[in-house]
């Protein structure tokens, strides 16, 4: 056995040397050098300083500008709210614990941090799924002439919270549990042990199949169909330069969206699956911490991809930041209307 299981924790190191100590009571500098904990704290501070303001600004700008409160934008606001939860309740705890070198808030604090980090991450993940489905419905029109309304948008948001809760809540009530992971300064579901008391095995199988495989399949299908539809429409209007430009923009955005999703979740899910199917195998605390870096970074690059690259949101943000006077003048506003025209022309009639 290459790990040590204790009361609500698992350390990826054998206790034959007698070095292993509870991550709730003692610094974990035997797992990694102190500077690595400080580097992790700096990384979390970076995400807090940049991720939290971008997500909060998205919420503020949407509240200030009525034209942003359109049904197709609701899910972007939900995505920003999820990022805010991750940054405020998750990143701040990891920052504090990394500075101290151990899970300084104890088992209860670990469970709370693990819950909010998982909830925010899952809301963000399912928001990307709903966003992909919404765009698929609007552009590909699988249901014919379908009017996307506020009720549909709110149903999509409710769906993200139901799915996220079905993943984040069970460990609080005995189906799996939240324990320190990586360098023992942040918490997540228990992938590491086969403790029958918590039915970890069934929970991990459920989480991997329902909360990773299903989203990946859905995103690849919907965005793949969207690109094919846009390319087919552009091929029928080859004489239109605006249509060709819109097709290229849509393709680039889809590639960015899919890559962003894969970068955020594939490393974490893959390593967690490897741990699950190789119980007792040797791995370092840093090896588990690195994939978590990518999933946490989604709170920063999701709003960049989905909000800051959205011309309408970007224009309103600049107006808000510069007190109603965008430094880009009228160009940005005009590009918004142009973008709308291009997208509608690419969409099949």
Curated annotation (Swiss-Prot):
Glycosylated residues (UniProt): 2, 15, 200
A GO molecular function assigned to this protein is: G protein-coupled photoreceptor activity
Entries under Gene3D superfamilies matching the protein: Rhodopsin 7-helix transmembrane proteins
Gene Ontology CC annotation, any one: photoreceptor outer segment
Segments of this protein annotated with the region Disordered: 328-349
Q: Carries keyword Cell division?
A: no
- Is Transmembrane helix given among the entry's keywords? yes
What about PTM?
Answer: Phosphorylated on some or all of the serine and threonine residues present in the C-terminal region.
Chain positions found as N6-(retinylidene)lysine? 296
| Bridged cysteine pairs (disulfide) | 110-187
A Pfam family that this protein carries is 7tm_1
**Membrane-protein topology:** Multi-pass membrane protein
Compositional bias of type Low complexity: which residue ranges?
334-349
Q: Where are the transmembrane segments?
A: 37-61, 74-99, 114-133, 153-176, 203-230, 253-276, 285-309
Instruction: Give the top-rank taxon of the lineage listed in the UniProt record for this protein.
Output: Eukaryota
What GO biological process term is on the record, naming one? Answer: cellular response to light stimulus
* Family annotation (SUPFAM superfamilies): Family A G protein-coupled receptor-like
Subcellular location as annotated:
Membrane
Residues assigned to the Cytoplasmic compartment are 62-73, 134-152, 231-252, 310-349
**UniProt KW keywords:** Chromophore, Disulfide bond, G-protein coupled receptor, Glycoprotein, Membrane, Phosphoprotein, Photoreceptor protein, Receptor, Retinal protein, Sensory transduction, Transducer, Transmembrane, Transmembrane helix, Vision
Protein task: Visual pigments are the light-absorbing molecules that mediate vision. They consist of an apoprotein, opsin, covalently linked to cis-retinal.
Protein family: Belongs to the G-protein coupled receptor 1 family. Opsin subfamily.
PANTHER family per record: OPSIN
Name it. Green-sensitive opsin-2
Gene name in the database record: opn1mw2
